[in-house]
Amino acid sequence: MWIPIIIPFGLRGKSKLIDNKKRICVNCKNSGVQLVKNDEWFHLFFIPFFKVKNGNMFLHCPSCGATIPYYEKETMPTFNNPDDVKFEAENNEKNHKKGKYDAPMAQVPPEYLQRQDQYPNQYQQQPQQQQPGYMDYNYNQPPVQLNKQAYDNYQQNDYKSNNQPNLAKENNISNENEELGDNKKEKKEKKHSFFSKLHKKEKNEIKE
């Protein structure tokens, strides 16, 4: 009797953390990006026995799951030969040339420069003149000393002009009081003359 035996084996990738340097993720701006290397191993019964293939290093962000390829600084091209450096400089000059739509720089004719020397700008030589109706406020000037007598006269005139309505009201009230007093005096005099006449009549009647 044959009994089938299943032996699990195969190739499987295994990730390895290279370092824990501080790197910032381009996607989520997180500072916990890890440098990881994913190698391929031979597994037997889910146990890694030997490495079959070296994998590439990449940057992995554990927060958002983004993977970015990583390039070592040593793999960057270095120009030790001066001819290579010259070739690189020529390529940069070709790339930075002006396009066909860029207008050329305007060249000033020599005749215009001669005329400009003969007739300089007159506005720069003329001094600035003060316009009429505007005061020149110079804060460095000394303070103006006021005349005390003129200031006192100004205050008196201002006080009189402000108190003219009150004075007019007072004059009107005094005139009204004088008129009332004159009327009362006239009434008293009339009463006195009336009673004096009655008294004279009574005396005359008694004598008779």
UniProtKB/Swiss-Prot annotation:
Residues 187-201 have a biased composition (Basic residues). Residues 138-175 have a biased composition (Polar residues). Residues 118-208 are annotated as: Disordered. Signal peptide: none annotated. Transmembrane segments: none annotated. Residues 118-134 have a biased composition (Low complexity). This is Putative uncharacterized protein DDB_G0288303. It comes from the Eukaryota.
